[in-house]
Amino acid sequence: MLKKNDIVEVEIVDLTHEGAGVAKVDGLVFFVENALPSEKILMRVLKVNKKIGFGKVEEYLVQSPHRNQDLDLAYLRSGIADLGHLAYPEQLKFKTKQVKDSLYKIAGIADVEVAETLGMKNPVKYRNKAQVPVRRVNGILETGFFRKNSHDLMPLEDFFIQDPVIDEVVVALRDLLRRYDLKPYDEKEQAGLIRNLVVRRGHYSGQIMVILVTTRPKIFRVEQLIEQLIKQFPEIVSVMQNINDQNTNAIFGKEWRTLYGQDYITDQMLGNDYQIAGPAFYQVNTEMAENLYQTAIDFAALKSDDVVIDAYSGIGTIGLSVAKHVKEVYGVEVIAEAVENSKKNAQLNNISNAHYVCDTAENAMKNWLKEGIQPTVILVDPPRKGLTESFIKASSQTGADRIAYISCNVATMARDIKLYRELGYELKKVQPVDLFPQTHHVECVVLLQRRKG
């Protein structure tokens, strides 16, 4: 029986959905970070349970031809790029397999073609938003990323998958915080001022927003700090402060203040302009989000007399992208600020046939049914937990012909597809899209169509 610190030779036979290597020894399944299929390694046992164990690589005996040898291991240890050690074409194959496996294991579907995952030409430096913790490391204020499964900060300047201008802004901010002797947050002591730095940059506009997340309102000499920062980066149009005094892992608290400029940046998506506020959800990979949304629009095969429901509508990016091609759009979003953003964004783009309400998706769906609104197409883009059963049932009762489902969690997507099939819909098309290159995450668009007769 293997025990902690034993070293054993193993072959990696698979990857978990999170990108860890899988090895089988003495009837146990071991999970090993930074190990790829076909690799033979000496594995040190870290932990053993009744059926599973965890190990780490002591030595590579045979390495995979698909290993990316150039990756800085800091990106693996932090989880920034937990699939970065796998060559990009193989990452795309891995993601296609994740979708196929979920559809088969959860929904029992094996007879629908899953298209190859749509990837990026340049799969690095793509993130338009950074959320960076600020902590003291070896007596110095540092910015970086937490080690995987911990709150130990690893100082980093180049985040590999972020817009390089954002990385430059973070480093400049770090240096200014040091210069003005502003204290980093200390989780254990519940002390210090600066918790996190959040930076957004418009992919097309180049506009930059900086958010200082602090434990209390007063920031000593913040005006001088902002003045120095804007000298370096004149593209900054917004500096916000968010106050979070709670003992929590949540980035933002409830109180927001505008320290400089406006409280939003503007950027484009599929030809429309969008105002993006500090707390607003906006896809972090603009290039691939456009591919994702365009795929959903193409799948829906929209016509000028279509009535479209846009559930989980965010700031209106999907619904407003289709509004000019259809009769009406009805959007629902549970976050009030996002609904206000949607309405402003409709005005910004001279769109008058898009209507937004603040409610849960299932409540709004039921209310629209009562009001006699009969959608022909439903677009859904739910959070990771997927759709609720009540929403699926209510949306099925509308008689909508087509449902385009955008998913950020293929397991919950497969679960939801299973119920839709029971309620009279067929799965017609499946297209995975790589919004998060170098990570194990995969987005997917599927088309569900109502069965005839």
Range-by-range predicted roles:
Residues 198-202, 208-218:
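Carbohydrate-binding surface patches
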Residues 61-69, 73-184, 204:
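Extended interfacial segments that mediate partner engagement and assembly in macromolecular machines
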Residues 2-9, 17, 217, 221-453:
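Rossmann-like S-adenosyl-L-methionine
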Residues 1-74, 107, 355:
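Terminal RNA-binding accessory module
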Residues 115-122, 187, 196, 432-435:
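Short, solvent-exposed loop/turn elements at beta->coil junctions and helix N-caps
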Residues 153-195, 216-240:
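Internal alpha/beta scaffold segment
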Residues 21-26, 144-148, 211-213, 342:
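Short, acidic/hydrophobic/Gly-rich beta-strand patch recurrent on exposed beta strands
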